[in-house]
A protein has these predicted regions:
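Acidic/polar-rich alpha-helix caps and helix-coil junctions
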Residues: 1-147, 158, 169-328
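Short, cationic low-complexity segments
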Residues: 151-168
Length: 328
């Protein structure tokens, strides 16, 4: 991670199309700092070019990259670099300069046969800025089942099928009473034998198009998005680290008011210092669950130890484990 050691080796940067001589085919790796600086340079150039267009051409709901998408990505990159000032500036640009609006989970349309679950990963969603990634790509590993047998009367055995991957108890238990995200963002596991949903088991599916049984629907449908909710969280975190706690709390209040039942929503007030920063970390986990951001957040949060259990086996990812670094 950038905030762990920006002088560590990252990926090699090849910035032109010239062929290399044979004695230079093994390219040297650039530092993490150099890679991030190049990313920022590229985003700055993209922003500059978009700003030469008229306002109506800077964003169009047509699945293409746009100025607000660039601005949200810049906010995210600056957040990873702990450039709190610019992270907040670009989060605010996304929030204030465009007409995107947070989806109120209290007012979602009633389920239909065509859309039994609300599809947050659609241009119909007022939060969506840019869509990417297919359902088939995202679920290639986690859309698997495991089977087990139970012995019944007279020595008969019955085979059952369960989802191989489910949401952790720790995540599910982090949602407070009245927090609508648990039910709206994550599908419950479906009992294929009894044709009912398990009440205490949640899958890793959600936010994109799902079938009536909570299964991924339409392999080519979009699975991920850049959306407004992240901008509020980026703003809150950047402001909290920049000693602007009132702005951080205001951003959290605006976001969470759309996520809780009105009579159970308690405004986040009085939080300061580390308590506020921890609160924001927890909200990122809940709001952005299964969107591909958690891994990057854990890396910049100090790469904490994680323990997973599978049956009787225990798997431990130690703090600062080399496995926290993606192989190049």
């Amino acid at each position: 991670p950038y905030n762990y050691n920006k002088q560590a080796l990252g990926v090699p940067l090849k910035l032109d199309s010239n062929l290399l001589p044979e004695d230079q085919l093994l390219m040297t790796r650039n530092t993490v700092e150099e890679v991030y600086n190049q990313i920022v340079d590229d985003l700055n150039e993209a922003e500059r070019l978009f700003l030469t267009l008229s306002k109506d051409k800077q964003y169009e709901p047509n699945y293409l990259v746009s100025l607000p998408m660039i601005q949200l990505l810049k906010s995210r990159v600056f957040l990873y670099m702990e450039n709190w000032k610019d992270a907040a500036i670009y989060a605010n640009k996304v929030i204030k300069d465009w007409s995107f609006a947070l989806v109120d989970l209290n007012n979602l349309p009633s389920p239909t046969v065509a859309e039994p679950y609300y599809n947050f990963t659609s241009l119909k969603s007022s939060e969506v800025i840019w869509l990417y990634g297919s359902v088939s790509d995202l679920t290639v590993f986690n859309d698997e089942s495991v089977e087990y047998e139970e012995e019944g009367y007279f020595g008969n055995t019955t085979t059952y099928y369960r989802e191989a991957f489910i949401a952790s108890d720790n995540l599910i238990e982090s949602f407070e009473d009245g927090d609508l995200r648990k039910e709206k963002y994550i599908a419950k596991e479906f009992n294929k034998d009894d044709k009912v949903f398990y009440e205490d088991s949640y899958t890793t599916f959600g936010k994109y198009k799902l079938s009536a049984t909570g299964e991924p629907s339409g392999s080519e449908n979009f699975a991920l998005s850049f959306r407004l909710g992240e901008a509020y969280l980026n703003l809150a975190e950047a402001a909290a680290h920049n000693n602007d706690e009132s702005t951080a709390l205001s951003a959290l209040k605006t976001l969470l008011a759309k996520r809780y039942e009105p009579d159970k929503f308690v405004e986040p007030t009085g939080l300061t210092g580390d308590a506020l920063k921890t609160f924001i970390k927890n909200e990122r986990r809940k709001e952005l669950c299964f969107e591909g951001q958690r891994w990057f957040d854990l890396r910049r949060y100090g790469m904490p130890q994680i323990i997973h259990r599978w049956g009787e086996q225990v798997y431990t990812l130690k703090q600062n484990d080399p496995s926290y670094t993606m192989p190049i």
